[in-house]
Every structure is written in C-alpha cells, then in structure tokens.
Amino acid sequence: MSDRALKFPADVVHAAQASEHDSGCPAAVSLAQWAVESAYGAASMGDAHNPFGMKAAPGQRSVTVWTKEFYGGAMHSVQAAFRSFPSIADAFIAHGRYLMNPNGWPEYIKAQDCWRKNRDWVGFIDAMAPRYATDPNYATMLRGIVGDWHLFDFNLPAGDA
C-alpha cells in the first residue's frame, strides 16, 4: 500500500469524490481540509463524524468540545458546539455544500469561479481560506498538502461534478 493510500484511506477519498459529484467542491481541497482539520483522521470527534470541525447552528445535531481559535493575534482555547453527522460521507457532503453555497460571501463566490471556470484549485483555496479558517497560514497548509500528496489526481474530470 502506498504512503498516500495510508494517509488518505479509500473511504475518505470516495467521500471526497462523492462530495465533488454532489456539490462541485474539488475533492483535492476537501481531502486537504480533512487532513488539516482532523490530523489525517486522528481527530474526527469520534461518533460525531465531523472531521472538518464544522460548527453547529442552533437546532443542528451537535457535540460540544474544546478547540483552538485564532483571534486577536493569538491562539485561544474555547468550547464550541460542532455538528454531528451519521457518517464521514455525510460530513463530506455537508462540507462541499457549505463551500459551494456562497451565502453571499464574496470569498466563496470567487473560490467557485476559480474552480468552475478554470479548474484552479490554488485559486479556490486562496479565495476560500480566509473566510473558512481563523489560522492565517491555512491556505499555505492546504496548498502544501494538495501539492505534496498530488491530491489533484482525485478531482473528478470536468463535467463529472
């Protein structure tokens, strides 16, 4: 088994590709976010199946856990309510829909344009990251993971998403 297959198990790759087929969100980006947010699956909130650290809105199924947030120029430990999903595949679908439904956020609209018009995963990451994460190095981390592991190989062919 290759190092990449060990780092990115088949069920996770399939979930990312199913999400891309459902929402259009590039599988490579979802996989890189999964790697960063869950430490390659080591921290997915157990039975909550939430590897992306997606926060819960009022009324959504959730678990409350300690997390780190970057604000005011420093990292802080805080408790927050995170969404709970029936499966990892459901989490990937929700994640893709979240990124591809811009809710009026110009960062997500720009990210979608980069991907849909030019298949530019770097532009997608650079546009999306400041809205998605509080860590100022988030885009750099994602770009590094996609490039180092050749995750762009997992993106669906244009027209299949």
Predicted regions and their residues:
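Catalytic cores of secreted/periplasmic lytic hydrolases that degrade extracellular macromolecules
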Residues: 1-161
